């Protein structure tokens, strides 16, 4: 059996941004996951670069955790936002995010996404603090505006993060996120047993 290693391609296909639409009520802060439907033929990881732009200065725009953050005005209407996506090799494309601001926007429940604790997250005292909101979703708002609650004696909620202690057995911490409309979603933090964690070598 002969095994060969293919050389890395010398050409790079630029990413392709796909249009996005977000609908939300006036005055909200939304976090649009615009990269979720963008494509890269080479399979390169995509990220946002620069600050998104809008011809209407009624929106305040920024980027957080590869999401387009927009503080919406009280004025209803359609707002067009442009953002730049880049791959890991310098290819770029400009995408369009349309934000429909309307008081008639139906409330959407947030979505909690499970978190799995890794050895790098565990502190020297055997505790772990998991920023659970970082991978949660709120289609008509921002996940970082959600309220976190957990009814588990083995865990504490601190600054909207879940703090737990590594034990002899794996366990799950069920938590709930609640948005400004009172709608909820749930997910779990998977806390591994001490024996499941690989030893960490400090440099």
Predicted region positions:
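Extracellular interdomain linkers/hinges and stalk-like, low-complexity segments
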Residues: 1-43, 80-84, 88-142, 146, ...
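Strand-loop-strand motifs at the edges of beta-sheets in extracellular beta-sandwich domains
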Residues: 57-72, 152-172
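Charged, amphipathic alpha-helical scaffolding segments
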Residues: 72-78, 84, 166
């Amino acid at each position: 059996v002969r095994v060969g290693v293919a050389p890395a391609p010398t050409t790079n296909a630029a990413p392709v941004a796909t249009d996005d639409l977000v609908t939300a009520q006036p005055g909200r802060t939304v976090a649009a996951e615009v990269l979720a439907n963008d494509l890269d033929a080479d399979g390169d990881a995509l990220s946002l670069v620069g600050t998104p732009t809008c011809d209407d200065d009624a929106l305040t725009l920024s980027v957080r955790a590869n999401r387009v953050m927009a503080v919406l005005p009280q004025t209803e209407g359609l707002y067009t936002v442009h953002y730049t996506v880049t791959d890991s090799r310098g290819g770029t494309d400009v995408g369009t995010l349309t934000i429909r601001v309307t008081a008639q926007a139906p409330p959407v429940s947030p979505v909690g996404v499970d978190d799995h604790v890794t050895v790098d997250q565990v502190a020297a005292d055997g505790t772990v603090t998991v920023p659970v909101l970082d991978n949660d979703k709120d289609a008509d708002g921002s996940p970082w505006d959600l309220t976190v609650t957990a009814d588990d004696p083995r865990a504490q909620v601190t600054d909207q993060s879940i703090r737990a202690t590594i034990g002899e057995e794996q366990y799950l911490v069920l938590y709930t996120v609640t948005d400004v409309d009172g709608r909820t979603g749930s997910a779990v933090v998977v806390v591994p047993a001490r024996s499941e964690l690989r030893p960490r070598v400090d440099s």
